[in-house]
Amino acid sequence: MKESQVFLERDRSRQQDFLYPLIFREYVYGLAYSHDLNRSTFVENVGYDNDNKYSLLIVKRLITRMYQQNHLIISANDSNKNPFLGYNKNFYSKIISEGFAIVVEIPFFLQFSSSLEEAEIIKSYKNLRSIHSIFPFLEDKFPHLNYVSDIRIPYPIHLEILVQILRYWVKDAPFFHLLRLFLYNFCNRNSWITPKKSISTFSKSNPRLFLFLYNFYVCEYESIFLFLRKKSSHLRFKSFSVFFERIFFYAKREHLVEVFAKDFSSTLTLFKDPLIHYVRYQGKSILASKNAPLLMNKWKHYFIHLWECFFDVWSQPGTIHIKQLSEHSFYLLGYFSNVRLNRSVVRSQMLQNTFLIEIVSKKLDIIVPIIPIIRSLAKAKFCNVLGHPISKAVWADSSDFDIIDRFLRICRNLSHYYNGSSKKKSLYRIKYILRLSCIKTLACKHKSTVRAFLKRSGSEELLEEFFTEEEEILSLIFPRASATLHKFNGNRIWYLDILLSNDLVNHE
């Protein structure tokens, strides 16, 4: 997005009203393609001709066709015959959808950058982007709380809801007409899919555009939640996030106050809770409080009414779970967390009398969920459902170096991500499964048994990197503490360079 800021900084004041002409600019599609290359997720269109890859010639041909209005006329019965957006030739549709995401992100990226500069957190923004930056906050705040609500944000059933939310921010009618054109064309092509699965299929075919629309849906409901939170509390509210000032928010806020004054007049008076914390990642959020569970039930009913009445999204009964932190754990970002009581006895002596004082302190215990990870490893064919390592037969055609490098990369990523666990035993078991799966894969490639392969190759020299890798990383971080590296193995280490979670971590 840095390139987009260079291109559009000169016209910054008018971009919000004139997004439609940007779809006809070649550099927009170049930005979309370079972004995919940087993320290493650009998919060559399987099932199409070799010419259906990104090139400047294809983009110019696409822009020329977009100027011809007859190519944009679509009917539900004519999708297969349409040369521009047909089911069999939808490569242009894919390119334009990627360009849509770039164009609609531009004004909000500029607003977000200016908001960071005004808040003077631009220097620490890179650290705040890390997934692990959430856990120090949890360790500091959650031991003092008693109850937690585990909330799963429901998806909008219809894509039109996402478009309507975006219309409150950007006022460009032609742009949204064309956006609806693509969304309805997608629904017509997948009419055999149920509405609930349709949005899931759309998220896979157009991930960038879908994530942008979905994030706006989440930001919309969070902005209303934050408004009511500040309205109900007389204390000063501090937020760890940067929220934009919405165009349509104040008119909607008056309507909300009117509605909640009728239906929740007695509820709002009970919402004064100075110790309430809200954390969200992707489609899951955590709401924690120190007060009685009655307040948490009030917030639960508030969320359900907000989703169903304001966003027309049906919320299932099991969407929100209220738990007591001292008795139950909650799942977030691949970890199981709960508040554990630490008891210690202190001996105190006064003159000739000796007293034993028991001190009870609370500590947030963050552990690795071994069973979900074993399920993920079994799904990826590294082990069976019981956790017994098996050979990765798909990789048997690769060279020995590539096989070992792949296993080491996965082991390194998991070890890097789960190094914040307070108990390392589960992490060592995961590394053992990957190590033995690597050995079995190499033995399968050479058509020999595991014992014969290790005897011929030498197990210590072949896979010693599985054991030395973590110590090498710690020696780089703490170069003067090499003699006490084993001390850090039992402690938590949170890394501020983790921007994405591994696929094996996403168990849900």
Swiss-Prot record:
Usually encoded in the trnK tRNA gene intron. Probably assists in splicing its own and other chloroplast group II introns. Keywords: Chloroplast, mRNA processing, Plastid, RNA-binding, tRNA processing. Signal peptide: none annotated. Belongs to the intron maturase 2 family. MatK subfamily. Its main location: plastid. InterPro entries: Domain_X (IPR024937), Maturase_MatK (IPR002866), Maturase_MatK_N (IPR024942). One of its GO terms (cellular component) is chloroplast. Transmembrane segments: none annotated. Coiled coil: none annotated. It is found in: Plastid, Chloroplast. GO terms for molecular function: RNA binding. It comes from Astragalus sinicus (Chinese milk vetch). HAMAP family: MatK. This is Maturase K. One of its GO terms (biological process) is mRNA processing.
